[in-house]
């Protein structure tokens, strides 16, 4: 599902919200989540899952074109872990 599909589904499910209102709601939620993660905070949505940051230490990588060794700096990457209810719902569908 894309962001625009989510907005369309939200607007269809709640007719009192216009498409612009649904778009604003999705934007505000995603912006708040991105801001929290960028500040190093963990996000937990009960029944859905949690978002946090995983540390990746510095390493030596390889340039795929030249084969030359390249130093890759340390970084933090977003990580999502599905909650128990979400895992069970997905498992029932398969």
Swiss-Prot record:
Keyword Transcription: yes
SMART domains per record: BHL
UniProt keyword annotation of DNA-binding present: yes
GO cellular component entries: chromosome; cytosol
Function statement: This protein is one of the two subunits of integration host factor, a specific DNA-binding protein that functions in genetic recombination as well as in transcriptional and translational control.
Alphabetized PANTHER family for the sequence: DNA-BINDING PROTEIN HU (PTHR33175), INTEGRATION HOST FACTOR SUBUNIT BETA (PTHR33175:SF5)
Entry protein name: Integration host factor subunit beta
The species this protein was found in: Nitrosospira multiformis (strain ATCC 25196 / NCIMB 11849 / C 71)
Lineage of origin: Bacteria, Pseudomonadati, Pseudomonadota, Betaproteobacteria, Nitrosomonadales
Gene name of this polypeptide: ihfB
């Amino acid at each position: 599902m894309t962001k625009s599909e989510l907005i369309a589904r939200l607007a269809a499910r709640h007719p009192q919200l216009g498409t612009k209102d649904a778009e604003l709601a999705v934007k505000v939620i995603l912006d708040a989540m991105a801001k929290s993660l960028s500040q190093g905070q963990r996000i937990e949505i009960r029944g859905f899952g949690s978002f946090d940051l995983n540390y990746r230490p510095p390493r030596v990588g390889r340039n795929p074109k030249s084969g030359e060794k390249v130093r890759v700096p340390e970084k933090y990457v977003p990580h999502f872990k599905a909650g128990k209810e979400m895992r069970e719902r997905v498992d029932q569908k398969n």
